[in-house]
Amino acid sequence: MTTLNPYFGEFGGMYVPQILVPALKQLEDAFVSAQLDPEFQAAFQDLLKNYAGRPTALTLCQNLTKGTKTKLYLKREDLLHGGAHKTNQVLGQALLAKRMGKTEIIAETGAGQHGVASALACALLGLKCRIYMGAKDIERQSPNVFRMRLMGAEVIPVHSGSSTLKDACNEALRDWSGTYETAHYMLGTAAGPHPYPTIVREFQRMIGEETKAQILEKEGRLPDAVLACVGGGSNAIGMFADFIDEPDVGLIGVEPAGLGIETGQHGAPLKHGKVGIYFGMKSPMMQTSDGQIEESYSISAGLDFPSVGPQHAYLNSIGRADYVSITDDEALDAFKTLSCKEGIIPALESSHALAHALKMIKADPDKEQILVVNLSGRGDKDIFTVHDILKARGEI
């Protein structure tokens, strides 16, 4: 029996080999007790403030909205130590691992940001670190691979399947099945088997909590909508969590449309997938007609995932959040626009959310509205990818 509800409506659950059930139950028990332990909370808050650099800024875009009546704010998770929102929850999970007496961390990574965050947390807290990463992602995210190794992590290339994030997830789970007595699996997003979606949400919810306090201070009211990109969905659920019970605030999640939904080369299972069982949970996913997991695609490695966190599936099913999609080209345009107009280079993942916000502004420039985009990470890791694309197009 679980202590916390493992489901969000019909989505979620704990679909894992029996051998892993005790490890997940131990994790749930440790999390529940840690949430009630003032010492644990004080240690977590201290790391967030003095190591990671929280609270992060809420920045008004001075130039992007000129000539319109929109106020566009960016929640600056790109300013966090490690370069993205991933640092928040790995610090929490690393403290949990120590609490459970674990000595090793297993992690998976796509863009490399969760890998970097896992590596820095392990270096700080004296834990061994093994990171599984698709061989294709290792090629396109070489700066982050070097960062991980520099901080003492072992990076293990995964050549099976599509050599991307879903395959790294499978290998990490396989490793954990044989090592769970000494190792903690530090899952990088708000997906997977219970209790991970709940743990990751709670260790990311300060994004929305800070945003709410900051926007009330700056504007005296809540925003009309908050936007975030959605791969597995951790940065988005971190932003949404504190606004779910605010009915006047729109929640907009932005999935990757890749080369276009009609091409099949995308990563948008919420709107264009079917419900199934994958990665230990019941959630929408990209499937072939005979039920096999289909390969996802996105220019951004961190969104290149064929499923999505179960709470997003639930919010979509009850109509509380809207989920849209943005193509590679639209994300690239937003990447360039923010860089040129505001002097902020966003991650390609975050550029998807920004692109949709810019679409909303362009569609009705005279609408008075306040929008907040969760700028989930910085774009340093993507400059070589973008450089090669722009060079091939003759744009540079």
From Swiss-Prot:
Gene Ontology MF terms in the entry: tryptophan synthase activity
Q: Which InterPro entries match?
A: Trp_synth_b_CS (IPR006653), Trp_synth_beta (IPR006654), Trp_synth_beta/beta-like (IPR023026), TrpB-like_PALP (IPR001926), TrpB-like_PALP_sf (IPR036052)
Q: Which UniProt keywords apply?
A: Amino-acid biosynthesis, Aromatic amino acid biosynthesis, Lyase, Pyridoxal phosphate, Tryptophan biosynthesis
Question: Which residues does UniProt assign to the signal peptide?
Answer: none
Whom does it interact with, and what assembly results? Tetramer of two alpha and two beta chains.
Q: Into which family does the record put it?
A: Belongs to the TrpB family.
What is the name attached to this protein's record? Tryptophan synthase beta chain
Identify the taxonomic lineage of the organism of origin: Bacteria, Pseudomonadati, Pseudomonadota, Gammaproteobacteria, Enterobacterales
